[in-house]
A protein has these predicted regions:
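Flexible loop/turn segments at secondary-structure boundaries
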Residues: 43-48, 97-100, 124-126
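Active-site-adjacent beta->alpha loops and helix N-cap segments on the catalytic face
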Residues: 74, 97-107, 146
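Residue-level marker for well-ordered alpha-helical positions
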Residues: 52, 75, 103, 122-125
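Peripheral docking tails and interdomain loops at the edges
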Residues: 107-162
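Non-catalytic terminal/interface segments that mediate subunit docking, oligomerization
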Residues: 1-93
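Alpha-helical segments flanking ligand/cofactor-binding loops in enzyme cores
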Residues: 79-82, 103, 107, 126
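C-terminal accessory domains/tails appended to large, multi-domain proteins
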Residues: 62-64, 104, 113
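Active-site-proximal beta-strand/loop segments in catalytic clefts of secreted hydrolases
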Residues: 93-94, 121
Length: 162
């Protein structure tokens, strides 16, 4: 008879739990979790789907999403970002709105000190990258790898103090 050693037991949720544990440690140390500001562009109909996706995406990694109902002006958006205390900002809207507003919004958020992320996978990314978008989140993307990169951006160490 042929015998093989048993496969090691793994829990697929464990890497995400490590990210949330890092968030819990930050909460215990500073009184606040890491935050991402949802920079919702356009109307509620334009941004709701991607804002909901982004909220769930980041919260799976222990990053609190700061939501809103959109903004009448870019200055209003930047003021809300600064007031949020977030280091991360995620642009959320439809592809049509991104075509006309995303580059200016990304530039403004980057100038305000944000690490800029965009919810979606637009065909034309070069202009967005040049404007400061560092990460694109979308269905089918590497959620765990992206969340680890985001944690590294804001100096969270998921493996510490386990």
């Amino acid at each position: 008879a042929i015998t093989y050693p048993a496969l090691p037991s793994i829990r697929l949720a464990e890497p995400f739990e490590q990210l949330r544990d890092a968030s819990d440690r930050m909460l215990a140390k500073t009184g606040a979790r890491p935050k991402v500001f949802l920079a919702n562009l356009g109307t509620v109909a334009d941004f709701t789907a991607r804002a909901t996706f982004a909220k769930n995406f980041f919260e799976a990694g222990g990053i609190e999403a700061v939501s809103n109902d959109g903004f009448k002006s870019q200055n209003e958006m930047i003021a809300a970002f600064k007031a949020s205390g977030a280091k991360l900002a995620c642009l959320c809207s439809s592809d049509a709105v991104y075509e006309t507003r995303a580059i200016d919004a990304a530039n403004a958020l980057k100038t305000a000190g944000a690490h800029v992320i965009l919810a979606g996978r637009p065909k034309e990314q070069d202009g967005l990258k040049a404007a400061g978008v560092g990460i694109f989140i979308y269905a089918g993307g590497d959620v765990l790898g992206t969340l680890r990169s985001v944690h590294a951006m804001i100096n969270l160490n998921p493996g510490a103090e386990r």
